[in-house]
Amino acid sequence: VVCSPTDTHAQIVQEAAAAGKHIFCEKPIDLSLDKIDKTIDAVEKANVKFMVGFNRRFDPNFLKVQETVSSGKIGKPHVLKITSRDPSPPPEEYIKTSGGIFMDMTIHDFDMARYLMDSEVSEVYARGKVLVDPVFERAGDWDTAVILLTFENGALGVIDNSRQAVYGYDQRVEVFGAEGMVMVDNNTPDTHIYFNRNGAHSALPLNFFMDRY
């Protein structure tokens, strides 16, 4: 199990493969495509099992979305929407070595987009801004991002990310197709809704990925 800092993943995986060990590695494998390719080559040469930690693929709710799309129940998929927002920013030292919002956070959404749509991405347009905390700008990163995807099957995708959602860990997915739509909302500790003269009140989303996934 490789869950060390990102810049050590590739070397450790290569050494584990050379030792004949099956490997589970936290994402990403590395920030360099060249090192990633060399690592994959080492794994294939060693003929060991290798898995990267994209935990959302095993979430029961997201699995239902994937099953619904792949079964054809909503027809040809047209638009995918993913909302992924953390409850609070990570420490500055982590930000500096994380590889940035796209490699550290959006990477899960890129994986989920390809998984749900069963199609590779042909075009990517992304914009990032610092709207939450100046610490991200000092680290050369962004804390807010919007990504537009075009898939090889012709569908479109939109991902929006933020490093801070004050109401909790915001994880939502929607796939709209020619014959219908499937969606997953946030998980909450309970589903009760309390109404009074000030409005409707319900539980906040689960705190973070440790609880959500």
Q: Where is each model-derived feature located?
A:
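Alpha-helical elements of Rossmann-like donor-binding domains used by nucleotide-donor carbohydrate transfer enzymes
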Residues: 11, 38, 64-67, 112, ...
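Rossmann-fold dehydrogenase core element
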Residues: 38-55, 67, 75-82
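A short helix->loop->beta-strand "cap" motif at the edges of active sites that frequently abuts
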Residues: 19-21, 46-49, 155-156
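Short beta->alpha connector loops at strand-helix junctions that form conserved
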Residues: 26-28, 54, 165
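Rossmann-like dinucleotide-binding domain that binds NAD(P)(H)
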Residues: 92-156, 161-167
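C-terminal glycine/acidic-rich active-site capping loop/insertion
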Residues: 55, 137, 173-213
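Beta-loop-alpha module in the N-terminal Rossmann-like domain of NAD(P)-dependent dehydrogenases
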Residues: 1-42
